[in-house]
Amino acid sequence: MPSAIKGVMVQCDPSIKALILKIDSERHDIVIEELDETHLVIDSNKVQAVKNELNRLLSKNIYNPFDEQ
């Protein structure tokens, strides 16, 4: 019997897609399908977790000159 997974299509640039794929490589339960270089279908129940993890990863890569003072 076929089963279906409710998904959300995400459009992003290739660098963000790479981060989402990195997050998925640790859990293997987020990405349902890679459509092309800028589109993914992800599990609709994991959208908020992906947003939180992306924000965490991106905040580590932001340069703030005031942090050095």
From Swiss-Prot:
TM ranges: none
Annotated Pfam families: Tfb5
Location within or outside the cell: Nucleus
Any one cellular-component term (Gene Ontology): transcription factor TFIIH core complex
Keyword Transcription: yes
GO biological process: nucleotide-excision repair, preincision complex assembly; transcription initiation at RNA polymerase II promoter
Superkingdom of origin organism: Eukaryota
Subunit-structure text: Component of the 7-subunit TFIIH core complex composed of XPB/SSL2, XPD/RAD3, SSL1, TFB1, TFB2, TFB4 and TFB5, which is active in NER. The core complex associates with the 3-subunit CTD-kinase module TFIIK composed of CCL1, KIN28 and TFB3 to form the 10-subunit holoenzyme (holo-TFIIH) active in transcription.
The protein's name: General transcription and DNA repair factor IIH subunit TFB5
Organism: Debaryomyces hansenii (strain ATCC 36239 / CBS 767 / BCRC 21394 / JCM 1990 / NBRC 0083 / IGC 2968)
